[in-house]
């Protein structure tokens, strides 16, 4: 992973993967019921749109629709620079397709506000033929829409929660 990709993971605070069962003092975390929040189709449309913006360098548009807590933590320039570096690390793309949609409810978590989050994972084939993975993360806000919380490309797919 390029240095820029690593810094974006900190800069945009993607919705973290659920951890193994924790001690009783840990924050509440659960997979959301299928009917909670918007449909998986809506999440896929939003994630596809976010990837189109990433692919065309429209980082300001991504910033404009980011979750409020992301905007409070990071200025637009840092967001754009980190996002650009992360996307550049992926390189030229031959194809990509979604691999998983996971919704997660966070309550009392240290780094993110309480709420419903979602990760959309993609398997991406680079022009070289190598497969990498891209995660687009969102938070369902009070306006009823999913707002971007992060973009995280990586070379290996971790476990998919609930599978």
Task: Give the positions of each predicted feature.
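Internal amphipathic alpha-helical segments of the cytochrome P450 catalytic fold
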Residues: 59-60, 145
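Short solvent-exposed beta->alpha transition segments
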Residues: 38, 44-45, 60-115
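N-terminal signal peptide c-region/cleavage motif recognized by signal peptidases
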Residues: 4-10
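Exposed beta-sheet edge and beta->alpha loop/turn motif
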Residues: 101-163
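Short, low-complexity N-terminal intrinsically disordered segments enriched in polar/charged residues
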Residues: 11-56
């Amino acid at each position: 992973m390029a240095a820029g990709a690593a810094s974006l993971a900190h800069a945009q605070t993607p919705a973290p993967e659920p951890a193994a069962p924790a001690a009783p003092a840990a924050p509440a975390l659960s997979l959301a019921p299928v009917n909670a929040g918007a449909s998986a189709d809506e999440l896929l449309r939003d994630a596809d749109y976010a990837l189109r913006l990433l692919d065309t360098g429209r980082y300001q548009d991504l910033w404009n629709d980011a979750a409020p807590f992301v905007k409070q933590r990071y200025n637009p320039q840092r967001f754009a620079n980190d996002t650009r570096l992360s996307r550049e690390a992926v390189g030229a793309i031959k194809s990509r397709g979604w691999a998983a949609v996971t919704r997660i409810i966070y309550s009392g978590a240290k780094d993110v506000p309480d709420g419903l989050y979602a990760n959309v994972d993609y398997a991406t084939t680079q022009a070289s033929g190598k497969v990498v993975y891209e995660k687009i993360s969102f938070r369902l806000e009070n306006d009823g829409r999913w707002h971007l919380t992060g973009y995280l490309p990586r070379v290996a797919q971790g476990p998919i929660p609930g599978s």
